């Protein structure tokens, strides 16, 4: 009886090991198959441009292409993206600015926005104050931005007027901002550059926060070099009603940016119906850039693949 029991026990262990090995093999095969299917799905979309012109930023595809921004640009182009944006372009070495511009030109890609600033004055109480020191800094930075734009083939540059000046009424602050932006436009307009004003939701100290406010300031500046950067993530947080507000401010919109809410990640990760928003933007005839100013919802290469697939899904609207 003892021998029989031992034999039975050995057989059970062998069966258990076989089942475990089979399950492990099946799991491994399943993961490999999924990886191949994912790679195949990306290759199927290989180099096929999106309907709209989405612009990624440095670091978004670093796990797939490496830390070098140039290599990320080449990878993104192979995935169908045709533009980049780079908030920190003004802080890059001159040779790197040129190299990025040359790479974009060779690939037939576009440069989106970079931020006009040398010392983060856009996060301070600056243009709203009306003080000459801030006007001088802005003028200096706008002149430098003209040279940077030449190197990287840029057309759009982001300007944020800064924080509230609590010692002045809103109307005085608005007048100060309009004056400053008219001065900036006079520098940029001869070069065909467009300053896009970004209304933000990051903190309550920021002066520029709403679409109607930004629209009014653009109308008052009255220059083709002063337009509205409609960041849909910020506008969703501050006011919602995205499609209606796009329509109301359409004549002054020079650039669009993307980010789902909550979380500020790629489309399909939050509450916003980007597939429908993109369809609306497309049917209105928008030919400009939509900046992907958001993070990746998931880490690593898998997260980057998920991001690409999210854009393919959101861009697959039916007309």
Annotate each predicted stretch with a short phrase.
Residues 2-63, 67-77, 153, 208-230, ...:
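Histidine-acidic metal/acid-base catalytic patches
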Residues 121-127, 165-169, 204, 237, ...:
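A short acidic, helix-capping loop that chelates divalent metal ions and anchors anionic groups
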Residues 20-32, 46-48, 107, 127-227:
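Active-site acidic/histidine proton-transfer and metal-coordination neighborhood
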Residues 46-59, 117-127, 161-164:
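N-terminal small/glycine-rich loop or linker at the start of catalytic domains
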Residues 87-105, 161-165:
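Glycine-rich, proline-tolerant flexible connector loops at the mouths of alpha/beta enzymes
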Residues 71-89:
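Catalytic domains of carbohydrate-active enzymes, especially glycoside hydrolases
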């Amino acid at each position: 009886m003892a021998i029989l029991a031992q034999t039975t026990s050995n057989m059970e262990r062998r069966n258990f090991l076989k089942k475990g090995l089979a399950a492990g093999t099946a799991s491994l095969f399943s993961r490999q198959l999924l990886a191949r299917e994912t790679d195949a799905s990306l290759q199927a979309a290989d180099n096929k441009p999106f309907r709209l012109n989405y612009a990624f930023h440095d670091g978004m595809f670093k796990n797939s292409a490496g830390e070098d921004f140039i290599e990320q640009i080449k990878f993104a182009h192979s995935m169908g993206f045709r533009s980049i944006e780079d908030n920190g372009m003004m802080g890059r070495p001159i040779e790197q600015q040129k190299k990025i511009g040359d790479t974009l030109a060779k690939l037939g890609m576009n440069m989106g926005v970079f931020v006009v600033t040398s010392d983060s004055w856009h996060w301070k109480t600056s243009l709203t104050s009306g003080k000459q020191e801030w006007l001088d800094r802005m003028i200096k930075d706008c002149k430098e931005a003209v040279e940077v734009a030449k190197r990287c083939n840029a057309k759009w540059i982001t300007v944020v007027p800064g924080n509230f000046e609590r010692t002045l009424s809103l109307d005085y602050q608005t007048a100060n901002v309009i004056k400053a932006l008219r001065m900036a436009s006079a520098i940029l307009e001869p070069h065909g550059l467009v300053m896009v004003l970004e209304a933000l939701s990051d903190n309550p100290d920021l002066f520029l926060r709403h679409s109607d406010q930004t629209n009014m300031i653009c109308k008052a500046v009255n220059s083709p070099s002063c337009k509205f950067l409609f960041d849909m993530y910020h506008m969703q947080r501050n006011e919602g009603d995205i499609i209606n507000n796009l329509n109301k401010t359409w004549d002054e919109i020079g650039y669009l940016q993307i980010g789902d809410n909550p979380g500020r990640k790629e489309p399909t990760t939050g509450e916003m119906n980007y597939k429908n928003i993109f369809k609306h933007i497309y049917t209105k005839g928008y030919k400009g850039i939509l900046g992907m100013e958001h993070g990746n919802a998931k880490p690593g290469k898998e997260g980057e693949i998920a991001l690409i697939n999210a854009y393919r899904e959101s861009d697959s609207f039916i007309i």
